[in-house]
UniProtKB/Swiss-Prot annotation:
Catalyzes the interconversion of 2-phosphoglycerate and 3-phosphoglycerate. Disulfide bonds: none annotated. This is 2,3-bisphosphoglycerate-dependent phosphoglycerate mutase. The active site is at 10 (tele-phosphohistidine intermediate), 88 (proton donor/acceptor). GO terms for biological process: gluconeogenesis; glycolytic process. SUPFAM superfamilies: Phosphoglycerate mutase-like.
Amino acid sequence: MSRTLVLVRHGQSEWNLKNLFTGWRDPGLTEQGHAEAKAAGQRLKAAGLKFDIAYTSALSRAQVTCQHILDQLGQSDLKTIRDQALNERDYGDLSGLNKDDARAKWGEEQVHIWRRSYDVPPPGGESLKDTGARVWPYYLHTVQPHVLRGETVLVAAHGNSLRALIMALDGLTPEQILKQELNTGVPVVYRLNADSTVASKEILEA
């Protein structure tokens, strides 16, 4: 049985390039971002993977990444579920701000705490812990059952929503997950055991 879960962070967005806090705002992909998403599809194709179902967020940068991947695999019409449970962490009042401007307004130390602490949210926004509190139950109830049935499942989402998933899958502490970087457009391939524990993990770097 396959029992394969593939996580892909969306390709570079226009706001990644401009150094802006994005969160639930909805900028498109850059030219590089489109290329990263297509390259992710090519790497998955080279690995011999085909999907049974795909999941993505309610935000276009993840949806377009998902579609590019499926197009590269010749699976353009695959059933794809879109749900805001997989959305990026909501940065609240920081959304749309340049990160340097935010540091000037609130101070470098405070912005660093908001960005890199596990359970301190920015004003009006979510912490990584809050993000995990919506992502992990969605995974357990909606995504994982497909994987455990032996299917190969794609989740195309965002840096922090995927970090919340990886934290739970890998059994990481808050301190460990905060040090983990997730590059845009790089597939992370998990194979699960029948009891839902991780049998193997592979990162398909370029």
